[in-house]
């Protein structure tokens, strides 16, 4: 089995995770959550997008001088995309509430919650410098994110929110492909 086939098999093996995630999103929105629950839910997503932006920007800043220029470009685009996603989700929250969001207070409140996710999980399991773990995480986590954002866009009746989330879902697919390309390259390396 070559690296492309191997990486494709990883995606196929994670299809149940992707489907379960879509089912959770659908069940959540079918439950008709209150405005407060929606806002809290989206604040978590907004903060996660900001955390991704910071972590990926740090990754770009610390790339070796001889790093592949295309990889630098792709990761830089991802950092930019995460900043856009942060703004889009902030705008969604303000659209729902009709009020400006106190971003600093929202981030502080979310940071006080004990849930470890994203980059914090990589640090917890001492994988934040492991190229293979990072590529695998990016491939699978961003692939899952693509499916989740698209499912939210499908479930949400408000077109302002749906269009914002469809854009985010599209970008997450690109981010997953960055991980896929890196993983294929690493799996070809001795």
Q: What would you call each of these model-derived segments?
A:
Residues 1-190:
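Non-heme di-metal
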